[in-house]
């Protein structure tokens, strides 16, 4: 809510990830939801949701992928049927970040026009709520501070006023989601740079503490070559990330750069 630019956000995420990457992932998903509402929401939706997303009383989840539809958005099967002033949602979503603790889910569904629409699903934090259930908690090899779940919808009703963008937003969910995911990808890159920085610093400390042949291994040229290559790749990744952030701040499309 401070109005900071994307470049500043990128630096913050990088530093957070240097200490604990899961925290940055939680913030990223929340930020994607806020960005979608700020860019494409109606004035009423902005006034209703954004203040609570800024003060922390609402945590957002982003829900696009499905068991048989990861990056293939054209294969979405989760459907919403219009019933008067409500939409009735049925289907299953996969890899939902913040799913359990969220109060708002940015839900991509297929509507009767066979296009994708984004619904703003309000719920109570927890594993079940009025036709919404967490059907599976997904275990991961790492990144375990970030909850990732499968969520099922059975006849869950969403008010028509919660269609992102209002009546004009019907059928435009894919465009809204991909626009916000540009920012999300910059965040992922920032996280990677932060973790790489932490790894490089750990390697430097170890190279100064570990001794062989009576000297720190840092003084062996073979190790110096390895550390120099690490530093070069780290700085290259950082500059590529910053370039994408600066272009986004300038209003450019950055799907390739991100």
Regions found by a protein language model. Give the residues of each.
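A structural signal for short hydrophobic beta-strand segments in well-ordered beta-sheet cores
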Residues: 78-81
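Glycine-rich beta->alpha junctions and the first turn(s) of the following alpha-helix
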Residues: 18, 132-235
């Amino acid at each position: 809510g401070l109005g900071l630019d994307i470049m500043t956000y990128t630096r913050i995420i990088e530093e957070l990830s240097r200490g604990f990457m899961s925290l940055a992932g939680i913030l990223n998903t929340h930020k994607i939801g806020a960005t979608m509402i700020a860019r494409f929401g109606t004035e009423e939706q902005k006034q209703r949701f954004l203040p609570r997303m800024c003060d922390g009383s609402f945590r957002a989840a982003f829900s696009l992928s499905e068991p048989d539809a990861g990056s293939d958005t054209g294969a979405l099967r989760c459907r919403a049927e219009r019933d008067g002033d409500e939409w009735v949602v049925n289907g299953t979503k996969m890899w939902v970040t913040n799913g359990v603790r969220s109060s708002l889910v940015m839900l991509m569904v297929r509507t009767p026009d066979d296009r994708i629409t984004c619904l703003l699903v309000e719920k109570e934090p927890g594993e079940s709520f009025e036709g919404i259930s967490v059907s599976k908690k997904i275990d991961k090899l790492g990144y375990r501070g970030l909850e990732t779940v499968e969520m099922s919808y059975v006849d869950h009703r969403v008010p028509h006023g919660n269609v992102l963008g209002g009546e004009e937003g019907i059928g435009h969910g894919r465009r809204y989601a991909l626009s916000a995911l540009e920012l999300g990808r910059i965040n992922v890159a920032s996280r990677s740079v932060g973790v790489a920085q932490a790894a490089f610093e750990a390697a430097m400390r170890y190279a100064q503490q570990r001794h062989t042949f009576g000297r720190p291994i840092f003084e062996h040229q073979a190790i110096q070559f390895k550390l120099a290559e690490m530093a070069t790749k780290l700085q290259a990744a950082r500059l590529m990330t910053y370039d994408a952030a600066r272009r986004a701040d300038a209003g450019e499309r950055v799907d390739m750069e991100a």
